[in-house]
Every structure is written in C-alpha cells, then in structure tokens.
Amino acid sequence: MLDTGWKVIGLDGMTDYYDVSLKQRRHEALKADPGFTALEFMLDDHESLMEACQHHQPRVMIHLAAQAGVRYSIDQPRSYVESNLIGSFNILEVAKFLGVRHLLMASTSTVYGANPEKPFQENHPTRHPMSFYAATKKANEAMAHSYAHLFDIPTTMFRFFTVYGPWGRPDMALFKFARAMLAGEPIDVYNHGRMQRDFTYVGDLVEGIRRLIDVIPPLPDDRDAAIDGDSLSPVAPWRAVNIGNGTTIELMDYIRALEDALGITAEKNMMDMQQGAVPVTHASNTLLKQLTGFVPSTPVEEGVAKFVEWYRQAYNH
C-alpha cells in the first residue's frame, strides 16, 4: 500500500505473546517510508484508539490485530476476550464514529470448525467452532455484521488459511520447525503428520487484501445482479471472503519443503492431534477470484524458500 501512495497508520500493541523485538523491527523497517506512521497501544484502550483515529481520520480501516493461536486459547482464554472481543468492539465503535468508506477485518478458516464439506465456501455453515479462538473470531463476524446492518458500515471479513512466510509468527509451525532444526533439536509433528492445510503465502494474502479494499460491499438497496456463491448479507453491506491457495498440502510435505530449503533432515517426534485442532482446511477461492480477478498461487516450495532466506538474514543463520 505504501508503494502505491497510501498513507498508512500502523497500530501494534507490542504484546509479549511472541518476541517483541520482531514486532519492533517490523515497525522500524516500515518507518523508513515517510508515508508510514507507527502507533503503539492496545485495542482495548478505547480512549487512545478514538483519539488516534480522530487525529488521523482514516477512510479505510484494516483490522488485523488479534490474540491468535488455537492451542494458547485453551490455557489463556481471557486474553482472547480482551483482544478479540473488546478490541474488535472498539474498532467497530470507531468505524461507526468516523463513517469509514470500508472496514476490513481479519477472520480465520477455523470458523468453519467441524464443517465436513470441502473445500470450505463462504456460505457454508460456521455454527460449530472447535476452539475458543475460533469462537471469538466467529463472534467478530457476527459483531461486525450487526454494526454493518445498524450503521451502514461497508465491511469485508477475510477468512485466512494458514498464512506463512517472512516476518511470520514464532508460534507457527514453520518458524518453530526452522528454529529447532537449525539448533539440532527434534520437531513435534502432530497427528503423526497427517494434518492437511491450505498453506497461503503472506505475499499472496497481502495482494488479496489490497485488491479487496476497492471491492466495497454495497448497501442492500444499491445492488446489481448477485454473484453466484457470494456471501454478501441480504440485510447489510457485509461479506466474508476466503483468502487461501485453494489446495491442501500434507504436513509432511510442508516439512519436506523446509528440509530441502535448509538442507537439513529433521528429527521428528510423532504426536497425537492437539485438542481444538482440525485435521483439514481447504479454501474455495472462487469468490475471491470473482471479486478481484486474483487467486493466491505461490507454491509451498517457493514460499518456504523465501521464509528460510528471510530467517537466515534476520537471525544470522
């Protein structure tokens, strides 16, 4: 967005859920561009959020902040309430106050939960979340829909599918595996490697978001012919859109791509599937393509190699 002339206000709470220095380095890299302004406070601080938004007057808001992680939500559910529910509520209040042109909010593929139908389509049911994290993101979708209906806030929810790549979260499998393998330590492989994920390279995710900024959900009275399979609400300017590669990769193939990129064969601890996890995620990206003309397409081998190149530079390996 900075490359195309946008002025970007980046807000990060700098929580210690993972390495704060990594977040700080991200902000420092972005601050090299004069179009970027860095802010630091928590989203549950409504007063600071409102003050900052009144000052900067954003016309588009992209809400990517959340307490992430399926497993962590079992042990620390309160942090998910504070960040994902209260924080998102504050975002909605600010969007209402400002009358933004478009509010875009991150959801997750985990909202599909126990849904047996594959690939996951945006109009599939999301009634059975299997983790508290997924439940909070499902609640975000419902909260945003109600505000879109009540206050005519054009809103797009992104459902992300296993994002990976440079600057990724250290609690994600790719980061953890690389760190362990370079240290000569074994890696924990859940569900004995039989997990399947729709791995989505971060660069593709960003491109999908960038294109969706200009695809503003219309008000119910301002619509042309419906798009087949659209998730557009009948009563609100609100829709959900999957951003995923549209293919499933077995965890063992993902690990092999990392082994090839690092030139190391991992020692593997085969483990049972963790509580709250789902065995398969698979995105339908038909709606994304219809709306934007774009679908993620970076092969796992290429994306993992880019991550390894970044990791070696960032951590001097």
Where are these regions (language model features)?
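N-terminal Rossmann-like NAD(P)+-binding domain of SDR-like oxidoreductases, especially those catalyzing
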Residues: 1-163, 212-213, 280, 294, ...
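Residue-level recognition of oxygen-bearing side chains
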Residues: 48, 79, 86, 125, ...
